[in-house]
Amino acid sequence: MIKLMAILFLVFFGITASAQVPRVELRAVWVATVSNIDFPSSPTISSDVQKAEFIKLLNMHQQNGMNAVVVQIRPATDAFYPSPLEPWSQWLTGIQGQPPVPYYDPLQFMITETHKRKMEFHAWMNPYRAVFNINNSSITPTHITKIHPEWFLSYGDKKYFDPGSKEVQKFVTAVVKDVVSRYDVDAIHFDDYFYPYRIAGKEFPDDASFRKYGGGMNKEDWRRSNTDSVIVMLSRVIKQENKNCQFGISPFGVWRNADKDVNGSNTKAGQTNYDDLYADILLWLKKGWIDYVAPQLYWEMGHDKADFNTLIEWWSKNTFGKNCYIGLGIYRAGSNAAWKDKTQLPRQIEKLRNTPNISGMIFFSSKTFEKNPNGWNDSLRLNYFKEPAALPVMR
């Protein structure tokens, strides 16, 4: 009798758990190419080895239940595809401007292999980062920083496009237009890097641009208006080229702290989208300029300054009818005490699935899954992602 009851208990709760799995859900992973974080493993491997690595990566994520990959194709004003505007990436071939050997189009290859597995391919591009490290980056003479040095500003050890320059806004838009017009990408995806994160004691050196284009605004509002302008331009050109291509943004997890704005979250983040990165994500959602938002909530539940639960609930109330996916910091499993807790990721998945207006998740990043941290690959494959999910439709 006890054995029978135990069997019935397992059957009942097994069915209940299965029934709770969403039938529509983004299950994606970021694949970072900058500094060869995730792919390729080295900039010196051959094209054939690159292809084999990407296929292995895709197969792993498909087995784990993912239905999309977000692949970085433009890490620093360079390209993982033949571009008429920017050189081949140093993280692809070891030397910026040098094509892969034997020659192939990595972006087309990755899209084809991804779609073959019925997964979405989101093309991840960094809008303003031009030189990753001014001390040791490989820069070809045909790089745009050499052709138009007046468009760029150095800050810390990096070089950035000047977001206030109208020419820069047009150029960034042209780069995105080129990709959407030639490739069957399911989305253009930008991350949190708009204006750079502040460096203590250093001001971003855009005074000359502000004097030229400021138009009577204060500098903070002017900077936000620059970011707004390029988002509007990108939104329009993406839909003109392919009305089915999504435009998604994955911002830093805090829009504003509540002590700065009553509409902000109950957090104490040292920097925020609105006040420091000059990215007014809520405006873009309200205006319908972007199709989805994927805030990077890499903190754990109970974090004293940016609690996961507090933030996911805040974002769920501020989607403005657009799809909202949660960026999960699985990479922290090896270095953060809270993330060494085997229940941290399962609890976060359960929380997001039980929070209104949240339509899925994106994991940062791909390489972490190679180690099966805390056995979470198995948890996804055998439990949380056991049943396939349809991809959310664009709203």
Task: Please annotate each region the language model reported.
Residues V24, A32, N36-A52, T112, ...:
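Active-site-adjacent "subsite" loops/lids of carbohydrate-active enzymes
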Residues V31-T33, I37, C245-A269, L311-Q348:
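Active-site clefts of carbohydrate-active enzymes
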Residues I37-D48, W88-Y104, S154-T173, G215-T227, ...:
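The substrate-binding groove and active-site-proximal loops of carbohydrate-active enzymes
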Residues M66-N67, R117, K146-W289, Y298:
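Polysaccharide-binding and catalytic clefts of secreted carbohydrate-active enzymes
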